[in-house]
A protein has these predicted regions:
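Flexible glycine/proline-enriched surface loops and loop-helix/loop-strand junctions
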Residues: 5-9, 150-154, 560-562
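Extracellular/periplasmic catalytic domains that process cell-envelope and extracellular macromolecules
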Residues: 16-20, 134-136, 463-466, 619-621
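Pocket-edge structural micro-motifs
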Residues: 28-29, 36, 144-146, 474
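Active-site-surrounding "flap" and adjacent substrate/cofactor-binding loops of secreted or lumenal enzymes
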Residues: 2-6, 15-22, 27-91
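Intrinsically disordered, low-complexity linker/terminal regions across diverse proteins
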Residues: 2, 52, 195, 233, ...
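Noncatalytic, helix-rich "gating/capping" subdomain that lines the substrate-entry/channel surface
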Residues: 64-366, 370
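Hydrophobic/aromatic-rich, well-ordered segments within soluble, folded domains that form packed cores
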Residues: 13-34, 156-178, 571, 578-583
């Protein structure tokens, strides 16, 4: 059968009751959502998760193969799955850490303890990593960001809506303290309540999720002297000295030498007011409160690697309360996730050999090229961009780099000291040492433009503004996103929209502040930026009005409590989605023209003519199949708890609005399904947002 006769869709699964003109998302996905029962170990399942599950099974097969070439990945996997040894050890693997915290005689001593524990996986109240400098994208620099809290974000500590979550959090902390031997029920409950008060003071200095994604506000270059002054009561010099001594005393320190103080001479602070607040917190806090914070974070940070009682208590809160899961995932599945996170490229290289055909890479590279061509036409013909900004935008687009499938520069794990004869915690300490050394040793060095931030077995994609690069790992290049045997319509609606989305991040509210070389640099005229922000404001307002159906039903008796989408938090992803669909449509039209020997023509009339000429398959036109393919990739079902958490912290909108909220702004959607003003999906023409 010819490829052109295969739609790549499953029309039999579509709704016979819901119409696409009223709810495209549920027309395509409604019957599945209504009948699919989430397994007890899942908080969410959908198109992305199905592919991740497939990759998970494939990685397991590799790790359990006696001839597995990824020996360090295999050793870590087996250490995690050896529950007999883990359960026998109890809390012993971290007892020395806790003793060191308990014995700290003053704040400086505690600072040194925290510094000594950080390289091997200990928690701290700020996070540190080495990666590209937005002001000098050719070089890496140390970045410092806020940290120090155990709930998803600062809102969980102050909003009445989260009071029940805080109660459960306190109960979890108290139980973990009892399990670690820090008193009876009454004593540990008092400690847990005090801990929440301490952590709430830290959270009060945190920036919210909208502010932390602001590229300009979070770019604050400084130096070691200024940082030391800001953290005068924390004693940064003592912390660094202890960190260095602990790191140097390990095999990783020998294999990946670094001078922490030297590389911190130039740094970027993401949230300056947080560090000032953290210093005030240290100045005002009692030593016992600081030790309590360190003690709890040491226990909860390692709980998932400790014996059953710690692991189950940790899951009861983070898995059940926050995410709604009913039971833990199988141990082997968690082991695969751990390996993917620690040394994913080690096993990923074998994954690519076994499961990624070179033909898929070639087809994807062609699709990416078509999408970039479509963006070029869209920018060139924009009716709201001035010529100066168009020129800069086209220059940036010409410098885009696409990476497909897998890296050609695999990470070297020689310094990763994971061993078959070591316990899980010891191996995880070795993994933390390796990762700290690997990341921080980049500071001051040229950026490795061949490095990937995702493993090939990851079902995702990303745009990195400081490199002006879009990356598509191998695992996402499968149905429903990409089917090499299918007609183009569903592929452009699936992976084409994803490609367009990632390219679109280069021109969203944050990515548009970086130039073609990845430098944080304003290349817009004031007039064009104002017009851009006018359009994004309209999209923000649209999304602010969206409430996920499942939460509207949950709060039906008190609708005012129903949480809604945060348009400002999700605007970057929404711009990416909207641009992705519009540009993928244009690229699909260009592909149809190319197949029929016609020259590329970006006029609306030519695009419509090309789309109308596409063959009907499975009773749908090419234009309809494009939108049906797009809706298919967002098939998702999740528990209420996770839906609420994501509304607070996730910059992505819920799946139903990544579908319906986007296509109602796309004129060709109305043409595809003959949408009328009386239909639920209708949005008046003057209210539709058009950006790219």
């Amino acid at each position: 059968m010819s490829n052109a006769l295969i739609s790549g869709l499953d029309p039999a699964s579509f709704s016979s009751v819901i119409k696409p003109v009223d709810d495209l998302f549920r027309y395509v996905n409604g019957p599945w959502i209504d009948t699919y029962r989430l397994p007890d170990d899942r908080s969410r399942y959908g198109s992305f998760d199905k592919l991740a599950e497939d990759a998970e099974n494939q990685i397991r097969d590799i790790l359990e193969d006696d001839d597995c070439p990824a020996v360090k990945s295999r050793a870590l996997y087996h250490a995690f799955c050896d529950t007999d040894t883990i359960n026998q050890a109890g809390i012993t693997p971290i007892r020395a850490d806790l003793d060191a915290i308990d014995q700290a005689a003053d704040k400086t001593s505690l600072t040194r303890v925290l510094g000594s524990l950080n390289p091997t996986g200990g928690s701290d109240q700020f996070a540190m990593a080495g990666y590209g400098d937005p002001g000098d994208p050719e070089h890496n620099i140390v970045h410092i960001e806020q940290a120090g809290i155990g709930l998803p974000d600062e809102a969980y500590y102050c909003e009445d809506h989260y009071a029940p979550v805080r109660e459960q959090y306190v109960a979890m902390v108290a139980k973990q303290l009892r399990q670690a031997g820090y008193g009876d029920e009454l004593q540990t409950e008092e400690q847990a309540h005090r801990f929440l008060e301490v952590e709430t003071r830290i959270a009060s200095h945190h920036w919210d999720n909208v502010a932390t994604r602001d590229s300009q506000k979070t770019y604050n270059p400084t130096d070691f002297a200024a940082l030391s002054e800001t953290l005068a009561h924390f004693d940064l010099a003592a912390w660094i000295g202890a960190w260095q001594a602990a790191y140097d005393a390990t095999a990783a320190g020998t294999a990946q030498s670094l001078d922490l103080k030297a590389i911190m001479q130039h740094i970027i602070v993401h949230e300056p007011s947080f560090l000032a607040g953290l210093d005030a917190f240290w100045a005002a806090s009692e030593l016992d409160d600081l030790k309590l914070w360190a003690r709890v974070h040491t226990i909860t940070g390692w709980a998932g690697m400790l014996s059953r009682e710690f692991d189950e208590t940790n899951f009861a809160f983070y898995g059940k309360v926050l995410s709604g899961a009913k039971q833990q995932r199988d141990r082997w599945k968690r082991g695969v996730s751990l390996v993917n996170g620690v040394c994913g490229e080690d096993v990923g290289r074998e994954y690519v050999k076994r499961h990624f055909p070179e033909s898929s890479k070639q087809r994807m590279e062609q699709l990416v090229g078509n999408l970039i061509d479509a963006y070029r036409v869209s920018i060139s013909t924009s009716d709201w961009l001035g010529e100066a900004t168009k020129t800069k935008a086209l220059e940036k687009l010409s410098k885009f780099t696409a990476k497909v499938g897998y890296t050609n520069h695999w990470r070297d794990y020689a310094a990763l000291d994971v061993r078959d004869d070591a316990g899980l915690v010891d191996n995880m300490r070795a993994a933390s040492l390796y990762e700290n050394g690997y990341q921080l040793s980049k500071a001051g060095q040229p950026v490795d433009r061949d490095e990937w931030l995702m493993n090939p077995q990851t079902v995702n994609a990303y745009y990195e503004p400081s490199l002006n690069v879009i990356v598509f790992p191998a695992a996402i290049l499968q149905p429903p996103f990409f089917n090499p045997e299918a007609d183009d319509a569903a592929n452009y609606g699936g992976i084409g929209a994803v490609i367009g989305h990632e390219i679109g991040h280069g021109f969203d509210d944050q990515g548009s502040q970086y130039d073609g070389d990845g430098k944080l640099n304003n290349w817009w005229t004031d007039e064009d930026r104002a017009r851009f922000e006018q359009r994004t404001k309209a999209l923000i307002e649209q999304y602010n009005g969206f409430i996920p159906r499942q939460l509207a039903e949950k709060y039906a008796d008190d609708p005012q409590k129903a949480p809604h989408v945060n348009g400002a938090l999700t605007i970057g992803e929404n711009i990416g989605d909207l641009g992705g669909v519009n540009i993928a449509l244009k690229a699909y039209a260009f592909a149809l023209d190319a197949a029929s020997g016609k020259p590329e023509d970006g006029s609306p009339e030519a695009i419509r003519a090309a789309l109308d000429a596409a063959p009907d398959i499975d009773g749908f036109t090419g234009l309809q199949r494009f939108f049906l393919g797009y809706a298919s990739i967002w098939r998702t079902k999740q528990r209420d708890e996770l839906a609420e958490q994501y509304l607070q912290i996730d910059p992505h909108s819920p799946a139903e609005f990544r579908t319906n909220g986007i296509v109602r702004n796309v004129d060709l959607f109305y043409a595809a399904f003959d949408v009328k003003p009386t239909d639920a999906m209708w949005l008046d023409h003057d209210q539709r947002v058009r950006i790219w």
